[in-house]
């Protein structure tokens, strides 16, 4: 509803500010944390986005590298050059940028060399079935290799069990998210979870230990 109405831009700015504020609080309490926010396609067309973002980071004294913005491939379709210019300005601040749900949109691979990206997030559509589908396993493996060869990190979505986690570890996947790693939590639950180091699985392969998606 918000996406098709007029609420999505102010709502996303509000969520983004709250995320930066929460990030400041967690880091002040000693947690090594990165927060990721989904970026609305409409907000990606807002020329004021870099200014607002810089204001939030400055006001709450947060290192820009501690914030990551997730962009869907579809969000880049309407005006790719305009979106690219805005993302370049955000990248210049030091904010991390990632493509969310990689492999399910309509964009070209050419975007990977034109955008200032830090990471790809491979969609759960492929990850959740990789133990049962040879095609999905090949797609996941190829995407991991593609990201690494381009100097990007890779995040796997939809890690629902230990088998998938082990397979991703074997492929060299950098980070993971899903119910096997951690279910949605409140702010206080996240603090307890991080303090207990539940994110460190046996074998030394870490999921998104410092990576908390917020919106």
Give the ranges of each region predicted by the language model.
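Helix C-cap/alpha-to-beta connector motif
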Residues: 1-4, 10-39, 55-66, 93
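Short, contiguous acidic/charged loop-to-helix segments that flank catalytic cores in large enzymes
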Residues: 2-8, 77, 130-135
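Short, conserved glycine- and acidic-residue-centered signature motifs
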Residues: 12, 83, 136, 140
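The catalytic core of metal-dependent phosphodiesterases that act on cyclic dinucleotides
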Residues: 35, 41, 51-130, 146, ...
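Glycine-rich phosphate-binding loops at beta-strand->alpha-helix junctions
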Residues: 40-46
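C-terminal helical cap(s) of enzyme catalytic domains, especially alpha/beta-barrels
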Residues: 169, 185-212
């Amino acid at each position: 509803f918000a996406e098709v109405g007029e609420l999505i831009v102010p709502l996303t700015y509000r969520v983004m500010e709250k995320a930066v504020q929460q990030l400041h609080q967690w880091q002040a309490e000693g947690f090594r944390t990165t927060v990721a926010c989904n970026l609305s396609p409409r907000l990606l067309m807002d020329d004021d986005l870099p200014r607002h973002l810089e204001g939030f980071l400055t006001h709450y004294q947060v290192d820009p590298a501690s914030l990551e913005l997730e962009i869907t491939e579809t969000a880049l379709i309407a005006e790719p050059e305009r979106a690219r210019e805005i993302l370049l300005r955000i990248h210049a601040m030091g904010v991390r940028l990632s493509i969310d749900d990689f492999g399910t949109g309509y964009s070209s691979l050419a975007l990977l060399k034109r955008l200032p990206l830090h990471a790809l997030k491979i969609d759960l559509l492929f990850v959740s079935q990789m133990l049962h589908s040879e095609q999905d396993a090949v797609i996941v493996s190829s995407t991991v290799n593609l990201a690494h060869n381009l100097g990007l990190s890779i995040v796997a979505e939809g890690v629902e069990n230990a088998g998938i986690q082990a397979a991703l570890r074997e492929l060299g996947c950098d980070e993971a998210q899903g119910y096997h790693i951690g279910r949605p939590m409140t702010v206080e639950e996240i603090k307890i979870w991080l303090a207990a180091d539940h994110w460190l699985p046996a074998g030394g392969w870490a999921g998104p230990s410092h990576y908390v998606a917020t919106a």
